[in-house]
């Protein structure tokens, strides 16, 4: 294994490294947080350190790591302490969301409050604690994991199943009889807070109360991990394709359109994108704790200034951006609120824009409903449409990523079949990371690799743990969902393989999923079509047999940013209805099928939305389609050709030819990988 957070010389100006002690294997693999690097300028900025590898000391820590994904934590004392604090503050029900104050999907360990109080470590879920009950709500991806991790104090709410209440409904029901509900206002959006408050009152509750001190933090006490404070670095024009000055100009045009005085930027990836900066405060996501305020004539970045080197400071100054401490944000929003209140009654009220994902606390600090408009972030919309530099970077990095995966799958088959090696899921994932690290501009993983054999593949977000995971069974389906961060792009790919002889049922299931992937990949649709409208294309072949999967079909992907990026996606979420796909979007196409206790199948490619030529243009609209950039073949022995149409076979042949062409030169002298690639891409 060679696991590191590497900073190629073409990506950074200067780097120095240090290796901390991780508490578990998954923490160690989370290179963005747990392998922090000191990014400092050298006397000659052009000279850099290429990469950082783990020391033998780190290997020892990895081997000693605990099995955090299946361990049940006794939460009795934690709940008792929380309930004591609730009583002191006259709170009958306390809500603990998963998010941090920036609405991040992936969070720093210091913000893992829901995991701490409940013991459930999945990325999605909400805990609700009353004075005598506790409930944890999560979606279908995590039913199995939550069932294993929650102790007897907790009731699992399986969100999405018939007759199962949402956490909001459960909370409102429990509030009957005048009970008060409390929440940290930095961890909930105004829209969710307003609706929850209304639902509580409809059920006879006292309403939702903002509790400005986080009660879980008080229970956590000195054991709570410190907030990360890793260095921030500049992403050059070679990778960003657009300067901060231009991005600020475009944002100010949006302020003019909406007649707003300022936009308060609260999403970490939006701050990073706007200022062409990257960090490593959040696991797998190259972001850093920060806010920003952009007015018609100023821009201010709120960040711990000690994280910025001279190059970053100079870049910000050249692009008209000031720097203030991270903790000054709420003080300055209150100044804006007071300025807005001072306008005369005859004037139209001053309006400030915030993202519809911004916190309730931020809206309150800016003056509330009168002075705040919650909007779909104009930065998020702009970020989702990649420029040509970013798109070309995505194409390039996926070729390199594909080379690493092809080499890995050939190696894994050889180890299991020819050498009869006994490899567990983590050992295999370690080797994949090693192969990726050998590629140019590799920085780290984009999420924890899902290396899963047999029944583990049916756990949609399964995470193997060192010393407590399964040995890969060559006679069972193997599902590998993985991704990487490169300076020129972010990857996310899933392939499902079989190293022995699959059953007819397994081949049929795999082929139905593959047909759905092809159907969506080849779809042509008018501009203005949303991912909501396209979702059924990927499910249609499963539906014919009464089958389905409990996750979305696709999500947006950042450019050397978050692997899950809004506002676009393909699925049945209401949010996707109002956001049409547009040329320049990059998103995943990943249908699947899962049999609990047996196996999981998922096939995932990343694709660019682009304009396509059609014979006609009804409605004088451009028509759009997809350009897939993932360069990894499908498992030949799992494909039942009898279920494929000739068009689907032609598509596979064209795709395989493209993969072989792009892999030219990558495996010179590597007979094992070359033979594997030729076999898996042989014509149908």
Swiss-Prot record:
Origin superkingdom: Eukaryota
One Gene Ontology molecular-function label: metal ion binding
CDD domains per the UniProt record, alphabetical: APP
Record's keyword terms, sorted: Aminopeptidase, Hydrolase, Manganese, Metal-binding, Metalloprotease, Protease
GO biological process per UniProt: proteolysis
Any one of the GO CC terms: cytoplasm
Enzyme class: hydrolase
Pfam families (UniProt xref): Creatinase_N (PF01321), Creatinase_N_2 (PF16189), Peptidase_M24 (PF00557), Peptidase_M24_C (PF16188)
Database matches in InterPro entries: Creatin/AminoP/Spt16_N, Creatinase/aminopeptidase-like, Creatinase_N, Pept_M24, Pept_M24B, Peptidase_M24_C, Peptidase_M24B_aminopep-P_CS, X-Pro_aminopeptidase_P
Protease as UniProt keyword: yes
Catalytic activity: Release of any N-terminal amino acid, including proline, that is linked to proline, even from a dipeptide or tripeptide
E.C. designation(s): 3.4.11.9
Cofactor(s) annotated in UniProt: Mn(2+)
Annotated residues for binding of Mn(2+) 1: 492, 590, 604
Binding positions for Mn(2+) 2 per the UniProt entry: 481, 492, 604
Cofactor stoichiometry and binding remark: Binds 2 manganese ions per subunit.
SUPFAM superfamilies the UniProt entry points to: Creatinase/aminopeptidase, Creatinase/prolidase N-terminal domain
Xref: PANTHER family: XAA-PRO AMINOPEPTIDASE 1 (PTHR43763:SF6)
Task of the protein: Catalyzes the removal of a penultimate prolyl residue from the N-termini of peptides.
Family: Belongs to the peptidase M24B family.
Protein name: Probable Xaa-Pro aminopeptidase P
Organism expressing this protein natively: Neurospora crassa (strain ATCC 24698 / 74-OR23-1A / CBS 708.71 / DSM 1257 / FGSC 987)
Organism phylogeny: Eukaryota, Fungi, Dikarya, Ascomycota, Pezizomycotina
């Amino acid at each position: 294994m060679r696991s590191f957070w590497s900073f190629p010389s073409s990506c950074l100006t200067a780097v120095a490294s240090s290796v901390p002690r991780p508490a578990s294997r998954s923490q160690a693999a989370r290179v963005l947080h747990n392998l922090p690097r000191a990014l400092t300028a050298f006397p000659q900025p052009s000279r850099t350190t290429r990469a950082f590898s783990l020391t033998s000391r780190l290997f020892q820590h990895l081997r000693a790591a605990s099995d955090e994904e299946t361990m049940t934590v006794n939460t009795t004392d934690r709940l008792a302490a929380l309930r004591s604090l609730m009583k002191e503050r006259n709170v009958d029900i306390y809500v603990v969301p998963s998010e941090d104050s920036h609405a991040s999907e992936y969070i720093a360990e210091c913000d893992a409050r829901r995991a701490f109080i409940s013991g459930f470590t999945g990325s999605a879920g909400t805990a609700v604690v009353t004075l005598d009950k506790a409930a944890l709500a999560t979606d279908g991806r995590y039913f199995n994991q939550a069932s294993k991790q929650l102790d007897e104090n907790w009731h699992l709410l399986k969100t999405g199943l018939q007759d199962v209440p949402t956490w909001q409904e459960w909370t409102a029901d429990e509030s009957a009889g005048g009970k008060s509900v409390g929440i940290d206002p930095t961890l909930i959006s105004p829209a969710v807070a307003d609706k929850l408050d209304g639902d509580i009152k409809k059920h006879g509750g006292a309403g939702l109360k903002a509790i400005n001190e986080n009660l879980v933090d008080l229970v956590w006490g000195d054991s709570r991990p410190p907030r990360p404070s890793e260095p921030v670095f500049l992403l050059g024009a070679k990778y960003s394709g657009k300067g901060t000055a231009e991005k600020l100009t475009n944002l100010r045009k949006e302020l003019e359109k909406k007649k707003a005085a300022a936009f308060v930027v609260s999403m970490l990836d939006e701050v990073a994108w706007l200022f062409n900066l990257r960090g490593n405060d959040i696991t797998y996501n190259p972001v850093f704790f920060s806010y920003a305020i952009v007015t018609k004539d100023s821009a201010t970045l709120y960040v711990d200034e000690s994280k910025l080197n001279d190059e970053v400071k100079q870049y910000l100054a050249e692009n008209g951006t000031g720097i203030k401490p991270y903790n000054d944000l709420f003080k300055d929003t209150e100044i804006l609120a007071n300025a807005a209140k001072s306008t005369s009654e005859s004037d139209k009220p001053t309006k400030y824009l915030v993202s519809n994902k911004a916190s309730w606390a931020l809206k309150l600090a800016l003056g509330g409903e009168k002075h705040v408009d919650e909007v779909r972030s104009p930065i998020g919309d702009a970020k989702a449409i990649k420029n040509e530099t970013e798109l070309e970077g995505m194409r390039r990095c996926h070729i390199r990523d594909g080379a690493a995966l092809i080499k890995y799958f050939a190696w894994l088959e050889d180890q299991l079949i020819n050498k009869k090696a006994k490899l567990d899921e983590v050992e295999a994932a370690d080797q994949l990371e090693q192969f990726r690290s050998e590629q140019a501009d590799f920085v780290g993983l984009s999420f924890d690799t899902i290396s899963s054999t047999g029944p583990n593949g049916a756990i949609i977000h399964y995470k193997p743990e060192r010393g407590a995971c399964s040995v890969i069974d060559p006679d069972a389906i193997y599902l590998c969902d993985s991704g990487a961060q490169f300076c020129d792009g972010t990857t996310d790919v899933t392939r499902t393989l079989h190293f022995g002889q699959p059953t007819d049922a397994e081949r049929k299931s795999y082929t139905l999923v593959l047909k759905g992937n092809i159907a969506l990949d080849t779809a042509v649709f008018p501009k203005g079509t949303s991912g909501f409208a396209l979702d059924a294309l990927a499910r249609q072949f499963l539906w014919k047999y009464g089958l389905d999967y409990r996750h979305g079909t696709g999500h947006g992907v950042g450019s050397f940013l978050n692997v899950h990026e809004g506002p676009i996606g393909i699925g049945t979420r209401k949010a996707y209805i109002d956001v049409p796909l547009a040329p320049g979007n990059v998103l995943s196409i990943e249908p699947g099928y899962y049999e609990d206790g047996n196996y999981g199948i998922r096939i995932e490619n990343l694709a660019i939305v682009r304009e396509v030529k059609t014979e006609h243009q009804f409605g004088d609209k451009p028509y759009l389609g997809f350009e897939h950039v993932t360069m990894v073949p499908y498992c030949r022995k799992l494909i039942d050709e009898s279920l494929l149409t000739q068009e689907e076979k032609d598509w596979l042949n064209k795709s395989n030819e493209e993969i072989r062409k792009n892999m030219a030169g990558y495996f010179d002298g590597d007979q094992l990988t070359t033979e594997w690639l030729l076999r898996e891409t042989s014509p149908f």
